[in-house]
Amino acid sequence: MFARTPRLLLRPGFPEDAPALACAIGDEAIVRNLSVVPWPYTVRDAEAFLASPRDPVLPSFLIFERTDGPPRLVGACGLGRRPSGAVELGYWIARASWGRGFATEAGRALIDIARTLGLPQLEASHFVDNPASARVLDKLGFEFTGLVAPRMNCARGEEAPARLMRLRLAARAPLEEAIAA
């Protein structure tokens, strides 16, 4: 599965993406805001991530900025199943691309995919000390559930408090919405 937005190409990662992936995410300021990413992050970690099995339905994408030349890797995003069975939206953006709206743009594409898949809702979380991610989730329409729970963070070497967010998606099927429009 692939997705395009006005500025981005979202596509699965391939083995040849490992060096660029390791370079883009190899920043403690990024990894300290992700729960399961190892630190320090190496090319070997990128190779293992890219070779790991993926959910056959829920997408996992690398995010590329569309340019006049070859697309430039700026992050990753995806939908994943939590142990509770809920579907979680996750993302990260390389530091050089912070503040350009890429997380919001990629998140909107994932929400469209979730609606197409007929998912009733999405969950997301952000560490309490990451207000930038809170702003992205707010822009995407997620609402705070009132729950703050500890989540493990490999870069921090400990659990840190994370706010649980939820987005309820349209109850109608995508085809019904298109017909009604």
Model-derived regions, located:
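Flexible, nucleotide-binding loop/lid elements of kinase catalytic cores
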Residues: M1, V37, P59-F61
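Acyl-donor (CoA/ACP) binding surface of acyl/acetyltransferases
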Residues: M1-A29, I63-A181
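Conserved GNAT-fold acetyl-CoA-binding loop/helix
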Residues: A29-A51
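Residue-level recognition of short, structured coil/turn motifs
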Residues: S35, L58, T116-L119
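A generic membrane alpha-helix/interface feature
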Residues: D45-E47, P53, V136, E159
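A short helix-loop-beta-strand connector motif used in the catalytic cores of GNAT acetyltransferases and
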Residues: L50-L62
